[in-house]
Each structure stands twice: as structure tokens, then as C-alpha cells.
Amino acid sequence: MTYDKDWALRWLNDFGERVQENKQLLSDLDQAIGDGDHGINMARGLSELKKAFTEKEPADLTDVFKTAGMTMVSKVGGASGPLYGTAFLNMSKAVDSETIDAEGLTKVIEAGLEGIEKRGKSHAGEKTMIDVWEPVVNALHQEDLTDDVVEAALQKTKDLKATKGRASYLGERSIGHLDPGAYSSALLFHAMLQTEVS
């Protein structure tokens, strides 16, 4: 498998479409345990990203992720902008050639996870997007990432008590709700798995 600039563009455009389709659901999930604007914020940021890609085609794979990072930081409100932004910027730094193989992709996604952990001062088990990213990275290392793995990771956030972010104010009452950031991250990785390599 070889992943290149065109693949990454298709992946992130598909992610944008999935977020647009699930905008209301993401905001509803966020309404239960957060500010209620995750869907709107993410949809706006990804729509701006699509525009950025159209106006100036990225030079290479690194540039795709760098553009994504800068756009998410500047156009997405709330905590998710800086977190996704940092993830993509870290991913751009982990790309070391025009194309990457499966091992390279694992390294790139892992760099994204590390960026989120550092920026959010968080780790797995705190009911955040990390609870999807970490199982995805682990599965990539084992070469067995599937849509089921992504979905299982997302569903597990329902039983976790939030100890980070706005949701942590709810304490025990955050249990029983899916984490919105984990949900949008699941959309990101479903899109990645469904984006065919050219």
C-alpha cells in the first residue's frame, strides 16, 4: 500500500463530508456533555479546509496535513480546533517522503496522537478523542485496523467518566454518553479506511 498526496486529499474531503452529514448528531452529543457546538465547529473548519485545498493545491503529502492543521487551528472554535490542528501539524512533520507505506502511515497517525496527548495534557481512559486515536494506533501497529475496531473504541467512551474538558464538570453524569470528539475521530478513521489507494 502506498499513500500519497491525492489519497490524503480524498481522505480529508471524505472526512469533511461525513462530519457535514453528522453535524447535528455531533452537536447533540456535545449538548449532553459539553458546549453543544462540536458539529457546527467541525463542519465549518472542514468546509474551510476544502476551500483551502481548492484555492491552492497542496504541494505534497506533508503540505496536505500542514494545511489541515493550520486551518483547524484558525477556523474551528472550542477545544477541538487546537487538538485536531496539533494532530495534523504533528502528522505533517512525521511524513518523510512523497509517498508513505503502511508503516509510514502508522508513524504519521501515532505522531498525531502524541500531539493530542501533549496539547490536551490527557491520556486514554479520560473520555476524549484519544480513546479512539490510541486503539487505532495500536491496531495499525498490529496491521489489523478495521471499521469494527474504530466503532468498538468509540462505543467504549460511553462507559467512561469524563475527567478532562467541559464534560469533566458532570463527573459521574458524563457516563452513558458518547464523547463527541471521539465520535468525530471515528468519522476520521472510517473515512481513512474507506479511502481507496489509487
UniProtKB/Swiss-Prot annotation:
GO molecular function, one term: ATP binding
Pfam families, alphabetized: Dak2 (PF02734)
Keywords: ATP-binding, Cytoplasm, Glycerol metabolism, Kinase, Magnesium, Metal-binding, Nucleotide-binding, Transferase
Cofactor annotation: Mg(2+)
SUPFAM superfamilies noted in UniProt: DhaL-like
UniProt catalytic activity: dihydroxyacetone + phosphoenolpyruvate = dihydroxyacetone phosphate + pyruvate
Location in or out of the cell: Cytoplasm
Keyword rRNA processing: no
Enzyme nomenclature, EC number: 2.7.1.121
Entry's Gene Ontology cellular component terms: cytosol
Note: Unlike the carbohydrate-specific transporters of the PTS, the complex DhaKML has no transport activity.
Its job: ADP-binding subunit of the dihydroxyacetone kinase, which is responsible for the phosphoenolpyruvate (PEP)-dependent phosphorylation of dihydroxyacetone. DhaL-ADP is converted to DhaL-ATP via a phosphoryl group transfer from DhaM and transmits it to dihydroxyacetone binds to DhaK.
Subunit structure: Homodimer. The dihydroxyacetone kinase complex is composed of a homodimer of DhaM, a homodimer of DhaK and the subunit DhaL.
Protein name per Swiss-Prot or TrEMBL: PEP-dependent dihydroxyacetone kinase 1, ADP-binding subunit DhaL
